[in-house]
């Protein structure tokens, strides 16, 4: 009998490793370049450039607004790191950048403590108020001639927790602290605009004078982001290009996705792990589909929505699965799909619907997220619609669709 230890040893020896730098697929990783966020970094630079003047007297404030996964945190972190370095190396100005997550530090006191810790500023053991700590921080910066940029990530959590007086103190700090040089500047990062616009006007007008919006990523932008991460994290030629196309089309905002780069990268990472587990030296489309069905929170909703489809929509979906299995391809032409649909309809003793109706069924299936469509490019004569399944080809899915078809047919009997 083979021991558990030997089984483990054999497994480790035979395992295929195609991800060489897994940390570069982590949500916390900030790469040296951020595709399609270069202009946002330039905007931040323009706002904070006055801090580089030797006689800078004023502080700056900016709101960063965008959905989760639109690159807000990574962009601000990269800006802060590079601005700090450029300020000292090229301008001889001392700038300290501090990034604070308000989900973990959602009170004025915790924020003041986190800033003090980042500055290595010793706080007396006797209890000090947050306001007193902020005054100590400013005095510390003044003595050392340092400008401080504080990025308050997930700032909405602070706004929902703190009282009006604490919010006012933080935002309008220099109404409370007398200073010739205002050394503390802020970057407020929020997911939703209403967290800012519900504030008292005296606070809102002060905080939202400058606003940088981060739109959801389009599919082409997600493709570039994923390609960059593949080059950083995977072995050469280890990820098939159609994997990147599939993930970027699934999550691209212009394709009906949420435009979330974080989930797109997570899907890529899991697809790599699935490929390694299966012993494949290359991440293939099926690995990406399996990863997507695990990660995508909408997948179960998609499957649940099948019960609401009518008979011919289900037959069309069944025809797509059958045609994909026959051709062993990842996508088929609209013509091939219609031929399979007509054949399958007759097997069920159903009159096939006309082309315009079939196209409308296809549009409905795309809206609920179970199929993808695209226009053919080079390599095909003429322009045609190519159709693919957004979920892995799975017998359980096929059986469920067949079950739903039989339910519809029996209800007619």
UniProtKB/Swiss-Prot annotation:
Signal peptide coordinates: none
Tell me one GO molecular function of this protein. Answer: DNA binding
Q: Where does ATP bind?
A: 70-74, 217, 229
Q: Which UniProt keywords apply?
A: ATP-binding, DNA replication, DNA-binding, Nucleotide-binding
NCBIfam families registered for this protein in UniProt: orc1/cdc6 family replication initiation protein (TIGR02928), PRK00411.1-1 (NF001623)
As for family, the record states: Belongs to the CDC6/cdc18 family.
Record-given protein name: ORC1-type DNA replication protein 2
Give the species this sequence originates from. Answer: Saccharolobus solfataricus (strain ATCC 35092 / DSM 1617 / JCM 11322 / P2)
Q: Please state the gene responsible for encoding this protein.
A: cdc6-2
């Amino acid at each position: 009998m083979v021991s558990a230890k030997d089984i483990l040893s054999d497994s480790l020896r035979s395992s295929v490793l195609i991800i060489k730098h897994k940390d570069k697929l982590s949500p916390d990783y900030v790469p040296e370049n951020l595709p399609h966020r270069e202009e946002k970094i330039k905007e931040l630079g323009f706002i904070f450039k006055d801090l580089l003047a030797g006689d800078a007297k004023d502080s700056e404030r900016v709101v960063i607004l965008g959905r989760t996964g639109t690159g807000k945190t990574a962009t601000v972190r990269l800006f802060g790191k590079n601005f700090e370095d450029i300020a000292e190396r090229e301008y001889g100005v001392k700038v300290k950048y501090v990034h604070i997550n308000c989900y973990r530090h959602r009170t004025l006191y915790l924020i003041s403590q986190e800033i003090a810790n980042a500055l290595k500023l010793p706080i007396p053991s006797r209890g000090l108020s947050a306001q007193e700590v902020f005054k100590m921080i400013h005095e510390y910066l003044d003595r050392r001639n340092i400008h401080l940029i504080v990025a308050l990530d997930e700032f909405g959590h602070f706004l929902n927790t703190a009282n009006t007086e604490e919010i006012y103190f933080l935002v309008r700090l220099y109404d409370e602290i007398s200073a010739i040089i205002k050394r503390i500047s802020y970057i407020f990062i929020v997911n939703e605009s209403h967290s800012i616009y519900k504030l008292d006007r005296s606070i809102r007008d002060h905080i939202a004078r400058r606003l940088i919006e981060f739109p959801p990523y389009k599919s082409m932008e997600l493709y570039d982001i994923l390609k960059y991460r593949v080059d950083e994290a995977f072995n050469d030629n280890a990820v098939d290009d159609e994997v990147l196309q599939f993930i970027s089309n699934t999550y691209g905002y212009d394709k009906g996705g949420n435009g979330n780069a974080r989930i797109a990268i997570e899907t890529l990472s899991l697809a790599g792990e699935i490929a390694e587990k299966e012993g494949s030296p290359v991440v293939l489309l099926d690995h990406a589909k399996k990863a997507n069905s695990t990660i995508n929170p909408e997948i179960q909703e998609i499957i649940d929505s099948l019960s609401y489809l009518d008979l011919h929509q289900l037959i069309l979906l069944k025809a797509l699965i059958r045609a994909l299995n026959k051709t062993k391809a990842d996508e088929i032409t609209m013509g091939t799909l219609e031929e399979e649909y007509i054949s399958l309809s007759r097997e069920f003793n159903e009159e096939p619907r006309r082309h315009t109706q079939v196209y409308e069924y296809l549009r409905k299936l795309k809206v609920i997220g179970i199929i993808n469509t695209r226009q053919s490019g080079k390599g095909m004569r003429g322009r045609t619609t190519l159709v693919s399944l957004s979920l892995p080809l799975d017998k359980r899915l096929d059986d469920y669709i067949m079950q739903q078809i039989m339910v519809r047919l029996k209800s007619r009997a």
